[in-house]
Amino acid sequence: MDWKAWMDAFLPALLEAFPRRVAFVGIQGSYGRGEAGPDSDVDLVVVLDELGEAELTACRALLAQMPFADRTCGFFCDRAALAAWPAFDALQLKLDTLPVYGSLEGLLPPMGQEALEQAVRAGASALYHAACHTALFDACPEEALPALQKAAFFALRLAHYRRTGRYVAARRELLPLLEPGERALLEDGCTLPALMAWAKQEMAR
């Protein structure tokens, strides 16, 4: 699917549904990274001036009329909610979103180095817990590894950004920049204890 052609149909319809009320529209996820496959979701970011029951109903109806409606998902919010969003989480939104209409500047909460530190620790701690939970409670832990490695990829992006000051969104571009031990977390042969060990190390930095 050509996400730009999809967006060329969606954006005018959204602007018509909410005249002078759309603050920002962007794309994130695999399409934003340039890594989409034939079954990838259309991962939207939409910021309105207000988002309540009426707006949710209108957005749902609009999305239902779009091609590939069953593959749309994303982050919808209003200005006030985004301004109050935890900075470490908003940082990830900023880094991972490709703008299509408007700008996130002026909409996001203040964020600095501490937000990045918190984002890395949050991603690492979530990975640690998920790997530990899988090892203890999943009937077939090895089947959960691909999903855990995807979570590790997101955490590794932030850790690399903290280490180098350069944010690299795409997996194919990030892999050669990682340390060998980090790269192994995304390759065949990765283990749950290895994911936990790396996550614990990043939380302690």
What are these regions (language model features)?
Residues 1-16, 20, 32-38, 49-205:
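Catalytic core of pol beta-like nucleotidyltransferases
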Residues 43:
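N-terminal loops that bind phosphate or other acidic moieties
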Residues 23:
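Short acidic/polar active-site loop segments enriched in Thr and Asp
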